[in-house]
Structures are given as structure tokens and as C-alpha cells.
């Protein structure tokens, strides 16, 4: 066999174990209801770009200023991604090289604050993110973190507390954004608070960027100095990151992405980002995002009607945070029981949680992935009923088996990657 012939073999021929794992994962995604709020399903076009020959290319630097030759088409890809993201979000500056949302945040920190500086962010236990100041994360290890919280009475961000803390601690940067906060964030109020103390205002919109792109959520680019995001989740692109900012921060951000925190960018992933931004610029994307929010609201109301407590009383976004501890349950057992019914969620802390993070008081639900499948409000109400049925019969495997059959009926009605269905093995 020649080297050319060897390189032309299929994955199934070269590595049947990995091939089978992919087949099984495809079947799993097709046969389960994906309700993890941070997950979604990309288009075939995004998958194709991610698996393209740009995987082979090294391209340290930026368009027109590379440290490697042969980057003319890489420059085309990166420029298209930047131009489309700028148009999509109305940003003056764009960097599409970050490998992830966390690395986007790390580069943004490095551009505007120094080690030891004071930074404010939403407490992880109240819905924030690891990179907003958790003690075990680079952010908590490198900077002096002052967390702010939600109010106990309504589980909404306490903007008066944010302002009081900002005036007391004089932070160099204030972060707005969350991983488990279901309500619209008042970016204008944050901007006013940041201006009052001379702080840089950064928004991490990783969870809501798709909603923002479609105009169904306020755009943080109108208020923030720097905006970071992932490109998967609601944006429905590849697993990666992006930074948007006012032009005056561009040079420092560029330096902190490369060479500050990364070497060569993942060109194949930048190509997939460009595709996802183009998809998000289409009118039908706004229709999809409006349905995402409508579906989350329908799911939340269905669970409330079934007697469950939804954190903050509902949702304005794609996220529903469910308090299961009030029903005598814990997040871990709830996640596992729902998984047996082929409903995928994640255990999650709720505000003022007294239970440990690995077995907290809640579960987090999200509507993006099932909306991609075609679910609307009626299906979401049915899903809420199925979740309630499992959680009120958590030790009854007969009930769970019955729910599993109903889930199978739903996934059959709304196939995922239907062109793959006949080729995969469960």
C-alpha cells in the first residue's frame, strides 16, 4: 500500500473503535432529548467546515501578518469570519481566533487588567461562570475578585448591591454575564455603574449570543467595552470563542490572544465560525431564536403547573433553572433518572444552595437543541410533563420506561441529522 493509499482510508478502516464511538454518539444524540442549556446541534455546513483540509494549516499571526507562508486562503477565511461577526453584532473590532470562551475571557482580562487588580463578577453559586472569578480558575488565582449576588427574595441580580460594591472596592473591571441566570441582564445599569467608578465593562454573552444576534435579547455591544462569547450554544456554531470590542482595545486584545495565550489559530474552526455567522445573518435565524425563548417559557410554565419551583419564577432566555431540592430531591439523582428516560440535563447549583456542587439542589434545562429539532410550545409542554413524571417517580423504573417510550416517539417525529439515521447503530 502506498502512502497515498494509506492516507485515503476511511475512519472505519483505520480506527473502528473511534468510528463506532462516533456512530453510537450520533445515535445517542438522535435518540435523546437534549436539554443541556449549553448544547446545540450544528448544521451539516458547520460540520463540513470543521472537518475540512484547513485542519492541516498553521497560521500564527493575523491576516496579512503571518509567521507562515501559504496563508492566502486562511486570510480569506479569517477576514470573512471577522466581517460577518462585526455585521452580526455591530462590533467595531472582532477577534475570531480564541479556541474557547474561557480563552477569550483570559485574553480579555489580560488586555485591560493586571495581576492583583480588582474585578467584579457574578458569583458562580448564583449563576456566574468559572472565569468570572472562581478561586480554582485563572481568574480567581490572578485577580482580586469581588463577587456580586442575586437577591434572596426574587433571585434576580441585585443592582443596588453591585453599585455599592463597586463604589466600595473601585474595581478595574466589572463583568456581566452568566452560565445559569435565566433573566435579561440590565446592561445599561451595569454601564452606568462601571462609568461611575472608572471601570472597564466586560460582558460574557456566551449563553445568549444567538439571542442577541437575532435581536431577541438586548445587545451588549451597545454598552460594553469588551464582549466575549462562545460560538456554540445558542449561536449554533463550532465549539470555540470570539471577542468583540470597541476599536481602542483591539491592539491589546490581539496581543493577548496571540502570542499572549495561544499560538496558531484553528483555521478549520474559524472557517466553521464564518459559516455559523453567515447562517445567523439569515432571517430564519431570528425565527429560530424567538422560538427558543418561547419554548423555554413554555417548558418553565409546564413545570410550574406540575408543582415544581422554577428559580426566579420563570425565564426570559433559553435557560430554565429548576429547584428539585424543594421536592426532596438532589440534582445528581434527578439528572441520572432523567438520563435513564433519555432526557439529558445537568445537575446545577441554585442561588443560596446549601448542598455541595457535585450533588446540588437543582438541574439546569435549556431549549436550544430541541428547538433545532423543530419542537414548539406544544412539544415543550409535553416535555415538561415528562420531566415531572420522572421526578415524581424517581425510583419507579416502570414509570421511567414508559417515559422513555414517549421520548422515543418524540425523537422519531423530529429526527436529528435524519440523513444519518439509516447508517448509525444505537
UniProtKB/Swiss-Prot annotation:
Pathway: One-carbon metabolism; tetrahydrofolate interconversion; Amino-acid biosynthesis; glycine biosynthesis; glycine from L-serine: step 1/1. GO terms for cellular component: cytosol. One of its GO terms (molecular function) is glycine hydroxymethyltransferase activity. GO terms for biological process: glycine biosynthetic process from serine; tetrahydrofolate interconversion. (6S)-5,6,7,8-tetrahydrofolate binds at residues 124, 128-130. Its main location: cytoplasm. Its cofactor is pyridoxal 5'-phosphate. It catalyses: (6R)-5,10-methylene-5,6,7,8-tetrahydrofolate + glycine + H2O = (6S)-5,6,7,8-tetrahydrofolate + L-serine. The modification N6-(pyridoxal phosphate)lysine is found at residue 233. Pfam families: SHMT. The keyword Transferase applies. This is Serine hydroxymethyltransferase. It comes from Solibacter usitatus (strain Ellin6076).
Amino acid at each position: 500500500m502506498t502512502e497515498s493509499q494509506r492516507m485515503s482510508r476511511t475512519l472505519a478502516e483505520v480506527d473502528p473503535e473511534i468510528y463506532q464511538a462516533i456512530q453510537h454518539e450520533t445515535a445517542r444524540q438522535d435518540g435523546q432529548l437534549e436539554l443541556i442549556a449549553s448544547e446545540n446541534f450544528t448544521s451539516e455546513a458547520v460540520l463540513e467546515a470543521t472537518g475540512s483540509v484547513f485542519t492541516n494549516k498553521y497560521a500564527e499571526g493575523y491576516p496579512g501578518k503571518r509567521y507562515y507562508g501559504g496563508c492566502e486562503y486562511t486570510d480569506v477565511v479569517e477576514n470573512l469570519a471577522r466581517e460577518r461577526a462585526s455585521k452580526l453584532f455591530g462590533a467595531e473590532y472582532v477577534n475570531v481566533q480564541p479556541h474557547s470562551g474561557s480563552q477569550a475571557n483570559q485574553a480579555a482580562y489580560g488586555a485591560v487588567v493586571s495581576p492583583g487588580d480588582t474585578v467584579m463578577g457574578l458569583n458562580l453559586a448564583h449563576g456566574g461562570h468559572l472565569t468570572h472569578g472562581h478561586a480554582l480558575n485563572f481568574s480567581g488565582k490572578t485577580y482580586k475578585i469581588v463577587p456580586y449576588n442575586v437577591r434572596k427574595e426574587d433571585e434576580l441580580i441585585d443592582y443596588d448591591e453591585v453599585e455599592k460594591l463597586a463604589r466600595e472596592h473601585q474595581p478595574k473591571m466589572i463583568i456581566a454575564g452568566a452560565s445559569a441566570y435565566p433573566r435579561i441582564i440590565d446592561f445599561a445599569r451595569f454601564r452606568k455603574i462601571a462609568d461611575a467608578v472608572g471601570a472597564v465593562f466586560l460582558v460574557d454573552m456566551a449563553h445568549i449570543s444567538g439571542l442577541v444576534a437575532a435581536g431577541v435579547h438586548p445587545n451588549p455591544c451597545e454598552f460594553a467595552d469588551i464582549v466575549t462569547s462562545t460560538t456554540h450554544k445558542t449561536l449554533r456554531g463550532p465549539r470555540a470563542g470570539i471577542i468583540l470590542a470597541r476599536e481602542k482595545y483591539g491592539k491589546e486584545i490581539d496581543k493577548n490572544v496571540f502570542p499572549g495565550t495561544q499560538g496558531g489559530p484553528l483555521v478549520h474552526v474559524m472557517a466553521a465560525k464564518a459559516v455559523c455567522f453567515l447562517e445567523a445573518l439569515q432571517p430564519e435565524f431570528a425565527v429560530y431564536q424567538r422560538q427558543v425563548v418561547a419554548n423555554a417559557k413554555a417548558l418553565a410554565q409546564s413545570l410550574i403547573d406540575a408543582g415544581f419551583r422554577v428559580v426566579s419564577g420563570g425565564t426570559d432566555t433559553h435557560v430554565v433553572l429548576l429547584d428539585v431540592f424543594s421536592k426532596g430531591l438532589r440534582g445528581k439523582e434527578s439528572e441520572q433518572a432523567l438520563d435513564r428516560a433519555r432526557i439529558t440535563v445537568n445537575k446545577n447549583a441554585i442561588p443560596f444552595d446549601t448542598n455541595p456542587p457535585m450533588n446540588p439542589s437543582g438541574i439546569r434545562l435549556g431549549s436550544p437543541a430541541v428547538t433545532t429539532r423543530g419542537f414548539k410550545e406544544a412539544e415543550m409542554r409535553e416535555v415538561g410533563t415528562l420531566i415531572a413524571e420522572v421526578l415524581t417517580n424517581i425510583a419507579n423504573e416502570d414509570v421511567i420506561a414508559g417515559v422513555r417510550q414517549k421520548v422515543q416517539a418524540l425523537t422519531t417525529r423530529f429526527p436529528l441529522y435524519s440523513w444519518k439515521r439509516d447508517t448509525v447503530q444505537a
